[in-house]
């Protein structure tokens, strides 16, 4: 049977739901919209962490929500989603979209993760679909996980590509193409240096530089400048993120931001002044810096966050593959708030 129990504990926990899930004990779902309401939670996945929630919460233009599943008072799973504005070239020009990186994090091996995710997914969809034009699940570790739940909640999948560099079997330099080796060596000989940002001014200068680089790519979303500062300084006791800089004669000409979670590093944003300083290859060094750092720190993989669609030529994917990574197939799941549009796309893609 299904036992429902709704109540409000605090004003910022706007919905709690109790379900059975064919488990011995009922599961309660809580939605947190304010960081100071979130209790201490287990977990090591940065994309569903309280730390990343705080970064989104303090960054202009983002609205995070964290759904936590409990059995009794014990958390057994959580999922972090964030709503942001998106500017499009076609109507509607400005929309709100909800993005989720992965499918959550789960702590009780005795529970059926697929069933638990299905309940969290239904809860999330009901929570955000009224205020988001689009819900997107991206960067899935296992593209098959949750298939039944996604389809039950009227999501459709689009095939995507994933690019990862292995760091555990051989040195990154050995994986580079010959042309990439020459470019890196030439840039370093010409005076370019790579370092980690350790002060406020460098992070601000890096953010402004990267924003200009992204402004020429209309489809690329770029967060408020404060996002990078917050991410870099959030919880210094943990290695959550690093800002890598490429400098020439003291000026920042390139850089990247990399997240760290479990045994993997994730390159989120990168870029450089490649036209002005072409002979220094700042865009290449901006990628090379986190690769070498992750290798030296013992991470097993470095993943590029957006490798693109499999049936479309993608300049960035071709660029990063020359660092020795391998591409594999994955998917992204989407749900539109317009029922007629979502139904049409479900028929087309399913």
How would you label these PLM feature ranges?
Residues 115-159:
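Non-catalytic accessory segments adjacent to catalytic cores
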Residues 12-23, 82-85, 150-172, 299-350:
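Active-site/acyl-donor-binding loops of N-acyltransferases
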Residues 7-8:
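Short terminal hydrophobic/aromatic SLiMs and anchors at protein ends
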Residues 62-64, 129-132, 241, 296-299:
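Short, high-confidence coil segments that cap the C-terminus of an alpha-helix
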Residues 72-75, 99-101, 106-108, 115-123, ...:
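Aromatic (often tryptophan-rich) hydrophobic motifs at membrane interfaces
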